[in-house]
């Protein structure tokens, strides 16, 4: 039986589910960019790509060399194809305008070019997260300048989302709104090949992922829930739990997607003005879309992540996602 490549899968989606051809081409271009990023990541010290740039991004985070390299790869791969009206990235203050010499398309691409990049120097899995939105009609004119407002759409408006994880294997996880598929990079073929047909998050779990060093800063509902997890079979939940924390959202969510679990990055008291650490547009929204399409759930403790109307491009949000029953439990604690 012949293997199904990403290209074949997308063509079949165009035939059977009316996936627009432009969206198909866009996903293929993003996948090619991820292959190039994977190549740079795998070189490590041999490629001279480790270490920091000595600069900061809009979030005030130190930029790693690979952050900037990955960002440039995604921009250069996608700007000329005619599928996009604009792009936005964790590494850029403002929306990226498609140069006037290239045709504009109907979609917007939002991405975190290298999530978990603080782990690069210690050889821990990192990844690229992306989200695709339709561009509002008023910005589709070739001469119309794109601004931040075009991107400020709730996660329910995403037409596709995915991430590439650069680990022992390079994988691409993708949803077009009809389930979640996993593709593994076959380096001999140079193609992503379908290896995970219908990914589902188990409804219950015995694992959770959270940075326990921040426990003293959490709000009471999170303190209560994690306390119950730690109490194990002698506590109210009557079973033992294991904690896993990689400090790379892609790596933590990928584990939860494949074997169940709960990922939490809650609001804490150190910066009361900030509702969370993770960015809504290019981290929480695409990951929440993927998790929901796999049968899981995602909230900020009170509301469904995908229903939140963004107010700014780099807006932060608290995130609780994963196995549905556990997400519903901790969300209920917030509402008591």
Swiss-Prot record:
Its EC number is 3.1.3.11. The keyword Transferase does not apply. Keywords: Carbohydrate metabolism, Cytoplasm, Hydrolase, Magnesium, Metal-binding. Its main location: cytoplasm. Mg(2+) 1 binds at residues 90, 112, 114. It catalyses: beta-D-fructose 1,6-bisphosphate + H2O = beta-D-fructose 6-phosphate + phosphate. Pathway: Carbohydrate biosynthesis; gluconeogenesis. This is Fructose-1,6-bisphosphatase class 1. It comes from Pseudomonas putida (strain GB-1). The lineage of its organism: Bacteria, Pseudomonadati, Pseudomonadota, Gammaproteobacteria, Pseudomonadales. The gene is fbp.
